[in-house]
A protein has these predicted regions:
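Acidic, glycine-enriched active-site microenvironments
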Residues: 3, 8, 24-32, 67-68
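Short beta-strand scaffold segments in enzyme catalytic cores
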Residues: 28-37, 153-154
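Hydrophobic "anchor" residues
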Residues: 39-40, 161
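Short hydrophobic alpha-helix segments
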Residues: 41-43, 165
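A short, polar/charged loop-to-alpha-helix boundary motif
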Residues: 46-61, 173-179
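Local cysteine-cluster metal-coordination motifs and their immediate loop/turn environment
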Residues: 51-52, 69-89
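Short helix-loop-beta connector
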Residues: 63-67, 184
Length: 238
């Protein structure tokens, strides 16, 4: 049976999405291990960045010999706070490794392919257009030392940003989506004018993700932020 590698790589990206924005300086990676065209194990980068996805997927007593490993980013090959994932891949007898992105960390970038000279492991880089921007923020920070910034704007169909008849311009789906996005970011910047008008909380209110609150920065040049706002009651840190 011919293997559709993209199916397993897309599954790996879905796993990587789970902890996106919650792995600190490490990228959120997803890993899927396949044997005889069936998934036998999966893992993602843990909260705060460790253990890595490959370790979590391979940390089992089942046999991984001659299995295929699918991972969103090339496995690390350097010693840091944890041993390199490449060591565990060799130890477990993985036969083939498929990945989508080279890491930009100079300690490991494009070095995983060198293990093929030590062991007969087939290594192949696959491109999935749908996920070409998945690590955009990680690459921007590490390559250019720049912050990754998104802008959130609510606009009506007729291009207005205020509707006097309704509290929201957006629907419940888009509002929930915004809460999810907030959990993936480190900080939110808003203005005192906007917060005074909406009395917005600017946090994540999805069960299970509500503890991932981005830091809040308010631009208030004239010190007009009201004292009785909801944001003043939800967290001392913010």
């Amino acid at each position: 049976m011919k293997t559709n590698h993209n199916i397993f790589l897309k599954l790996a990206f879905n796993i990587a999405k789970i902890n996106l924005g919650k792995t600190k300086s490490n990228p959120s990676v997803g890993c899927v291990i396949v044997k005889n065209n069936s998934v036998i194990s999966m893992g993602g980068t843990s909260i705060n960045g460790r253990p890595h996805a490959e370790f979590n997927a391979l940390n089992s007593n089942i046999s991984f010999k001659n299995s295929d490993l699918y991972v969103t980013m090339e496995p690390c090959t350097h010693y840091g706070l944890t041993p390199p994932c490449s060591n565990m891949i060799l130890k477990k007898g993985i036969k083939k490794v498929f990945f989508c992105f080279n890491d930009v960390d100079p300690r490991t970038s494009k070095k995983f392919k060198n293990i093929n000279f030590k062991r007969n492991i087939e290594i192949k880089k696959e491109i999935i257009t749908k996920y070409k921007d998945f690590y955009q923020s990680y690459f921007l920070i590490h390559k250019k030392k720049e912050l990754y910034i998104d802008a959130k704007i609510a606009v009506s169909k007729d291009y207005f940003t205020i509707n006097k008849n309704f509290k929201w311009l957006t629907n419940s789906h888009s509002r929930r989506r915004v809460h999810l996005i907030r959990s993936e970011y480190d900080a939110i910047i808003s203005t005192s004018k906007s917060i005074n008008k909406d009395n917005s909380l600017l946090n994540c209110r999805i069960n299970g993700l509500d503890k991932y609150k981005p830091d809040l920065f308010v631009i208030d040049l004239n010190l007009k932020l009201k004292k009785n706002l909801s944001i003043n009651n939800i967290s001392k840190k913010r």
